[in-house]
Every structure is written in structure tokens, then in C-alpha cells.
Amino acid sequence: MERIKELRNLMSQSRTREILTKTTVDHMAIIKKYTSGRQEKNPALRMKWMMAMKYPITADKRITEMIPERNEQGQTLWSKMNDAGSDRVMVSPLAVTWWNRNGPITNTVHYPKIYKTYFERVERLKHGTFGPVHFRNQVKIRRRVDINPGHADLSAKEAQDVIMEVVFPNEVGARILTSESQLTITKEKKEELQDCKISPLMVAYMLERELVRKTRFLPVAGGTSSVYIEVLHLTQGTCWEQMYTPGGEVRNDDVDQSLIIAARNIVRRAAVSADPLASLLEMCHSTQIGGIRMVDILRQNPTEEQAVDICKAAMGLRISSSFSFGGFTFKRTSGSSVKREEEVLTGNLQTLKIRVHEGYEEFTMVGRRATAILRKATRRLIQLIVSGRDEQSIAEAIIVAMVFSQEDCMIKAVRGDLNFVNRANQRLNPMHQLLRHFQKDAKVLFQNWGVEPIDNVMGMIGILPDMTPSIEMSMRGVRISKMGVDEYSSTERVVPLHQSKVECSSPHLL
């Protein structure tokens, strides 16, 4: 307070004000700060004072033959004085206006080809339908999503070689175009861009957009294909969502979808053959999607799906350590466990052989309408923090986590026989039998689970067996969070070949 008074006192004296406003800056440290290096230290200020000058732009001398010295209003467009330190002409911003209005019109045929991704986006938005806005709590999960629709699936290195070959064909440097897609794209683009007058650097930037998949880790509630991600800012906020139907599909989303379908068919067929691994690899090598070999797509495509992961693992590619169970993607974020077969008795005295996971583990669970963090030990749920859109979604997540925990009270809550079958009329494995049973009716499971008093933690509440929220009691270990839970993005590992079939499909359930 004393300092402020002192400063106010100083500022009230006219001499102080004069010193501060009129004296030149000649302190070496300040001069150094603003003059060392080529990086502009205050671009906004620089632009302001440059534009206040009469001739802030410099241009090649040829400009004097292409632009008159004065415009129709008699204002000077360029100065006869040379720019100090170069042999360029100093030009007024008015010259830009003159050029835009009266300059030559070039051939525009290349613009839609170069800015293809932008033109296509405009078309998609024009033909898309925006529906009503709903106000509700949005549960967003950070996921790795594709942010530029319409791209090919080249790796950064492959794209770099294609771009160099198309834009700078005479530059020195070894470029090896090996893959079929590289050669096709190069040929196509060279033909498209004959006599193109757009700056090569801009062409290179735009080609990169077209050829390489760009992904970001973004909070999303709802559709994750690239045609939805490009309008993310229009379709979801913190407390609202707007319905949207894209006005067109794009190749990369189709490829992702086709890849999942192809991988599922291949895994299904390989599973019943004499040598599953050899047969799976043979099918991956002989399959094409949209004219590109499936093995090439698998190397570049980051789609995380069970069957796709099995194919990648079989090829010795890196896959993420996630697996699916009960419609949720589980990712282990810490801990480890060993598997051991154990026989357990249900409440109906039916014997089940389950693979018990011994050890402490933490998981994130990500579903379409709910997310959760699960901490568990051997056959024991320690903590479950759930976040979901509504009561139904939260209940689904709790059932899946309780079954996954393999707790004895869950197995004892079974009433009646477990005899669920899949579409091929084969009996489901015990874990899925249990899941199906409780998905039909979880009343006994929730009642048998037990409740506990809870502490008042900000952003967290309890949930009772009848699914009503409470701030005093909650089912043992279970809490509801107002915020979403992020998908875990950094646990990646390489699955050894010999165990790919088992490890990748569902390490915790097979």
C-alpha cells in the first residue's frame, strides 16, 4: 500500500510524467531484448506502427511496371525512393487494394484442386443437417480422433517423398516411391498440377493435409469419425449439444469402417482353421481395401478395435493394451496381474471355471454413454468412479465393473442357471455368462453388494442399490463423478507374435 501511495505521489509530479513519456529508451538491456535474433518480439505492435507508415511494404522493382504510380483518387501507390538495405521498392497498402480490384485475373482451374480439402468441407457443411440444440450435462472423454477428413493414409515419410516429387521434382535428394498408393497419388497430382501458378510452398502444405492422417487427443461426446470432428465446436459445448448429420462421407472414414469389417471376418475365419496365425496372415496379405493392400493400411491406420488389433499383433505391429468387455473399452493404466483358473460356486450352486486375475490393477473404462476409473485387487473391487449421461448408463457401467471385479458376492448373487449362447449357438464363457445374467436383472447384485457411509468430496456423490443418488451413503467402493473420465492414451506395448491371438483379443477374459 505504501509503495502504491509513493508511486501515485511521483506520478502527480509533472516532471515524472514527462520523463516517463518523452525520454528515449537507451538502456542496453532493453535495446538488446528487442533487437537480438530475427524473431519479432512484439508482432502486434510492429504491425501497428508499420501500417501507420506511408510505405510499410517492400516489393520487387517489377511492380512499378505492373501498378500505376497513383490510383484513380490520385493517391500514391509506390515511392520512388528505394528501400534502405535492399534494391526493392517501398509500397503503400493502397497498392494491394488496387491490385485486388484491377490486377490481372489468373487461371483459377488449380484452386479447387489445391484447396480440395476446404472445398469438400464447404460442400459437406452445405449439405449437412443441423438439428435441435439440447441442453444437458455433457460427458466428454478425451479420445484420439482424426481431424482432417478426406486424407489418404500415407505415413509422414511416404507423404514427404510424394510431395517432393510432385512439387520440387528437380530438387536433389533420394526419393524412393515404393508403395502402390504413393505411385498412384504422384502420377495423379503431377497431371492435376501442370502449369500451376500457386506458390510451391502452399501446394506442399495442402498436399500434406490431403495425404497424412492428423490426429488430436480431444474431449468428445458422440461421433468420433472425422466428419463429426470437423464440426466439434458446433455440436457440443459444456452443457449443450446440437444434432448434426454430415452432408457426405469421406474416404478415410470409409476405410476405417471397411478395415474393421474385414478384420472381423478374417479373425472369424482364421479362428476355425488348422493354423490360425498362418491363415490370418495369408488373408491379411491377400485382402485389398479400396485398391490398397490391407497390410499397408494396417501399418498406418491407428483404429483401435479388437479384430484390427489381432491382425496388427499377428503382423508384429505395435498395438495398445486395451480390450473390450460388456461394451466398454478397458485400458490398464497401472499395476499387473497373473491369471489362474479357479472354480467358483454361484448362488444357484452351479460350478463355474473362471480365470482369476491375481494382483492390483487400475483401469479406465470407456463406453458410449459412460466412463469410469476402476481400481481392483484379486477378486475385489477397491474403488469405482463412474460418470455417465443418465441413470441407465451409470447402472450399465457399474454392472460391468462389478462382474469384471470377480468378487464373491457378485457370483453368489446369481439366481437361476447360466446358459446363455451366442449367435452360433455356442455357450458363452463364464465371465460373459455372468455379465448377461446381471444385465437382465441386477437387483440382487446391487442389494448384495453392501453400502458404506461416504465423505463429502467435491464433484463426487454416492449411489444407492436402487440407483438413487445420495450424499451420505453409497454402494461399497462406488462413487459418481460429475466430470468425465479420459481415455488413457499412453500405455502401448508390443504383443509378441506367439501370443497375439490370445493376448490381443481380450487379455482379461479368454
From Swiss-Prot:
Annotated S-S bridges: none
Keyword terms, alphabetized: Host cytoplasm, Host mitochondrion
Record InterPro entries: Flu_PB2_2nd (IPR049110), Flu_PB2_CAP-bd (IPR048298), Flu_PB2_middle (IPR049111), Flu_PB2_N (IPR049106), PB2_helical (IPR049113)
Any Pfam family: Flu_PB2_5th
Gene Ontology CC annotation, any one: host cell mitochondrion
Highest taxon of the lineage: Viruses
Subcellular localization: Host mitochondrion; Host cytoplasm, Host cytosol
Primary subcellular site in the record, as a coarse category: host cell
Functional summary from the UniProt entry: May participate in the inhibition of type I interferon induction through inhibition of the host mitochondrial antiviral signaling protein MAVS. The knockout of PB2-S1 has no detectable effects on laboratory infected mice.
Protein name: PB2-S1
Species in which this protein is naturally found: Influenza A virus (strain A/Puerto Rico/8/1934 H1N1)
Gene expressing this chain: PB2
